[in-house]
Amino acid sequence: AVSKDFVHWKFAGYCSFDGVGGQPDSEKTYWAPGVIVEGDSAHMFVTLKDDSTPVWGGPSNIVHFSAPLEDMISGWRRVNTVVDTPISIDATVVKNGDRWDMWYRDRPTEDTGGLYYAQSNDLYHWTLKGLAKGDINNVEVTKHTYQEGAYAFQWKGYFWIIADPHKGLAVYRSKDAENWEYQGIVMYEPGTRFFDNTRARHPSVIIRNER
């Protein structure tokens, strides 16, 4: 969907990948895309499942697609697989100086679930760094045993991550995008507008006029 004011939106079509898709239903599952623009290209880091069977479409990887800015509906072409563990989901990417940082939900083993991070100097080659540092995976501080759908951005001199622990949205901030401090929960109570009758889930943020 596209908008000029972030209030009024117009449906623009269904995305296709490597020329396949463009319809409401797909044999594969693409969810929780993290999209970043660099130069004249858009880069999508999406949770990709090779089927769409209930309930969640089977094992998943985080896969990199790119598209020219003038065709962000049907221009997506696969670049590579960034995270190949079978339960990796929900990537978010932010530029940090001369590099890019990614965070995602993963559970490589039964006892190591949490938010993980990776770093890249070019968006194409990534180094997996392990569990995110600071308070993000510190249950004693946050009381959150599960978080997904994280979104990272920069605002007012800090890097921020807002994640979904299924009880409102958990907020973290950091000066260096590595050592995170927990800021608490927001949007726990349901809203009052039409279709806004539940607590917030899976966030995304756009900064306009310093807000």
Predicted regions and their residues:
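Carbohydrate-active catalytic/glycan-binding domains of CAZyme proteins
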Residues: 1-211
